[in-house]
């Protein structure tokens, strides 16, 4: 798409990887409970750097929400496992939400199909954008 996005793990972030984050960036923190010590600390470090932070969580009142710029509280009735504890359905909700956000950001940035074609020449999508078929 032409949209710069990176994955930053909480543990590696505080051991040197914070250098990839600048003041112009937006960091989306994903935390089901919002109270994990390393996530709260990362949010505090990002705030000190002047980086815009958003929290996506399933917990209305949490420590991380007190430190970030914006919070989006999501709802989930059940994780889908027999004990309702494994991050199963919540990770799917995150994926759907983040994919939708990426599409909307691309739209607002004015990314065109030609831009997408240039930035995604490989695989089935690249072939389709060139009007080719891989398998018949």
Residue ranges of model-derived segments:
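Internal, active-site/partner-interface "lid" segment
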Residues: 66, 80-81, 106-136
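Glycine-rich phosphate-binding loops that contact phosphosugars or nucleotide phosphates
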Residues: 1-109
